[in-house]
Amino acid sequence: MKNFVSMHAILLACSAGAGLAAITQGISEGTYSRIVEMATISQAAYANLCNIPSTITSAGKIYNAETDINGWVLRDDSRQEIITVFRGTGSDTNLQLDTNYTQAPFDTLPQCSGCAVHGGYYVGWISVKDQVEGLVQQQASQYPDYSLVITGHSLGASMAAITAAQLSATYNNITVYTFGEPRTGNQAYASYVDETFQATNPDATKFYRVTHTNDGIPNLPPTSQGYVHHGTEYWSVEPHGPQNMYLCLGDEVQCCEAQGGQGVNDAHVTYFGMASGACTW
């Protein structure tokens, strides 16, 4: 028995409270396929990009020894995309970043007025900012017609979100896919992401915040410390498929965050049947 409540119970709760409009069942086959493809790349980042599609090549490595932030800038010529992917937590050094909940002003993005982000992840961002911006600019200059895609899982998801917000000041063709993303910033930051990427409009969004059953990491850091999720949540329940994806508006509706998951659990490390770094897909 899965450790999350049935959708029937969820829909009943919503009809009695916030209303059925808060949750929509099902997404298109194309959107689902794209989400799974990005999950594959994000999970492969734990194992040096094992088993990623053959159309994707590496344009450069992202790495900082002090923070152990790892990632790559990739290029998919078949789709005309420049893809930035960040690895999730893979070391005690990363864990220290994870648990630094002190919010930091988002000073590198002055356009984001009043914005504050997760202190540990901001330290991570500062440590690789020049690398990321340099590699992306290099590729964007060589391939000006290519769009940008940014993705990651767990810590890598928050890194992807912060990176996307930062790069949005320079580029306007960014799409973001995050998996098991912790809460990454305050209300001002969440509102900035929502507006920039139309994250609350499923018909136009450029930001897909994907969760899985009772993944415990999206419950962290707690809202009591001023953290708020951005945008529409794309909640995946089992068995996996486009009709078992639910679009959940807002931060605290009855989807992933309401399922009682705590911290790193099975639902966090496995997305769409792919375990982080397992390379068995």
From Swiss-Prot:
Binding site residues for substrate: D98, Y101, H268
Glycosylation sites: N100, N173
Signal peptide feature range: 1-21
GO biological process, one term: lipid metabolic process
InterPro entries linked to this entry: AB_hydrolase_fold, AB_hydrolase_lip/est, Fungal_lipase-type
Cysteine pairings via disulfide bonds: C50-C279, C112-C115, C248-C255
Pfam family, one: Lipase_3
Catalysed reaction equations from the record: feruloyl-polysaccharide + H2O = ferulate + polysaccharide
The keyword Membrane belongs to this UniProt entry's keyword annotation: no
Enzyme class: hydrolase
Entry's Gene Ontology molecular function annotations: feruloyl esterase activity
EC number: 3.1.1.73
Enzyme active site: S154, D215, H268
Keywords assigned by UniProt, alphabetized: Carbohydrate metabolism, Disulfide bond, Glycoprotein, Hydrolase, Polysaccharide degradation, Secreted, Serine esterase, Signal, Xylan degradation
Subcellular location: Secreted
Gene3D superfamilies hit by this protein: alpha/beta hydrolase (3.40.50.1820)
GO CC terms: extracellular region
Top-rank lineage group of the source organism: Eukaryota
Family: Belongs to the AB hydrolase superfamily. FaeA family.
Function in brief: Involved in degradation of plant cell walls. Hydrolyzes the feruloyl-arabinose ester bond in arabinoxylans, and the feruloyl-galactose ester bond in pectin.
Protein name (Swiss-Prot/TrEMBL): Probable feruloyl esterase A
